[in-house]
Each structure stands twice: as C-alpha cells, then as structure tokens.
Amino acid sequence: MRDAAPPIQVSRTRTICAAVFGVVLAALLVGPAAKAAEMSSAITYLYSSVSIYPPSATSMTVCYGFVCRRREMLDFTAADRSAITQIMAAGRASAAAERAAVQKVVVWFDRRMGPILGTNKRVAKADFRYFDDKHNYDCWDTTRNTTSLLLVLREWGLLKHHAIGDPRYRGNTLVLQTPHNTAVLVDRATKVEWVVDLWPRGYLQPPDVMTVERWVTED
C-alpha cells in the first residue's frame, strides 16, 4: 500500500501543475482580447447586433452587402501594419493632422478591400434602392468598418490626439432628412466630436470629416 502512495502524489502534482498552466495560458490568451474589448455599450452593440466579433490587433470583420449581410475577414499583414503606421505618422503633430491621416487610412482600407469584396464598384450613398448590395456598403456597414479601423489604430497606439466616440445618428422626417449614422472621433484636448463618414463618398474618395454639430444638420 505504501508503494502506491508516491504515484498518487505525482499524479496530484501533475494535476495541480496542469491546472496552473491552464490558468496562466488562459490569462495570456485572454489578456489582449480583454484590452481590445474596452468599448462603450454603443460600440459593443455595433458588433453584437449582427453577431460578429469586435476587431483585435490582428484582424477585423469587414461588413458589406447592407447591414453586414455579407462579411469578410481582414487579417492584417506586416505590410498592412507598416503602411497604416506610416500614414498615421504624418498626423502626430496636431489633432487636425491626425484627422487628415485617419482619412487616408480609410482610403487605404477602401483600396485594400475593394478588389476582394467587389466594393471597387461601389457608389456613394448606396442603399437598398440601388439593388446592388453585393458591391456596396450601406451606412451601417461604413459605420462598423470605420469604427473597427479606429479601434485597431487605438490598439496599435496610433491615435495620439483622439479617443473613439460613440456612433452618431441623424434623421428628421419632418424636414426630409435621410436617416444616417457614422463613426466618431473625439478630440482629447477640446472634447469636440468629429465624424469620419465614408458612406456619402464613392470608391477611393476621402470620407467626410467634420464636426458632429455640422454633420447633424446635413442631408
């Protein structure tokens, strides 16, 4: 009976070591995801409402086809990250320069995904009336995709002058204003909200960047 005791102790030790290793491994795996998941409830809803995961430092789900009915994974390569980092480096001097750099990153994204998705055929202000969902983004798609890009920029430490704001919405049927929504940046110094709105622009055109105060008055 005594001869059987040591193996039991070894087995217990192995079990404890395995459990500890599992906890450590889980912490390592969950750590970055938890950091990437630091989002407001409004931003979280952008993803949960269409059953997709938020972006991470390595990939994002690209929505198209109107309300994310079609989707494609963008796995960022080393070349992608280098290109985006170089674009954003030009915006370090000021908040205005950073917003201009973000515009260029969105154009980079449009060029990167256009031939893959077929959105290189897309038109400005596309919606169901165009009967061409497979080549287009609606404003929900552009809001999700642009917000995802902003979250990736934040994860990579490339946003110096701005935080990421909650999506903004507009639409007043009394004055025939079309319902619409957009991604938002918040100037850290002034707290002014700025939209980054790709939907009103065609393929490879820079997204609208303007204050929310102005944006809510436009059609």
Where are the regions a protein language model picked out?
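Low-complexity, Gly/Ser/Thr/Pro-rich intrinsically disordered linker/tail segments
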Residues: 218-219
